[in-house]
Amino acid sequence: MKSSFARKISAGENELVPAVVSVGYLAKKPRRIESFFRSGGGTDRRLPWEQLFFEGRFGASLAEESAGEYAKSLEMVRLAPSASNRQPWRILKEGNRWHFYLQRTPGYRERRLVKLFTVADLQRIDMGIALSHFELMVRDLDLDGYWEVGEPDIEIPNEDTEYTISWVT
């Protein structure tokens, strides 16, 4: 049985809509329901820089000054939205490469509500949003670079940490 949303967008019988993106401008004065969802979803609380960005190895926080011209792009990643506000991305700078890792939340996929409502890997979608925020800001700042897939020889902190892709400058 299709949801009313699926019917509204004319999703086919075998089509799956794992995520929806809203586009537009913020209202000058948010409605009560918007304020409720913003506060309840934790959108105003982001992990601090030192928990997301590393240099050389995991555990060695990247100083904002060491990020150089990429500091603003990393800040856009830090501010990117994510399901349940988990921010499941970690970025490790190694020379001229920025390695992006998915830091899985232990037990996240096993939670009852996530199992009930999830039809896609939301943390992987979150990673895509973070990658987009990074590249859009890099392009806006007119910085050079390209994406490359090739797992680096870096010790990961645990089995919940998965390499995704690298940005090469």
Residue spans of the language-model regions?
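Acidic, surface-exposed loops and disordered segments
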Residues: M1-T169
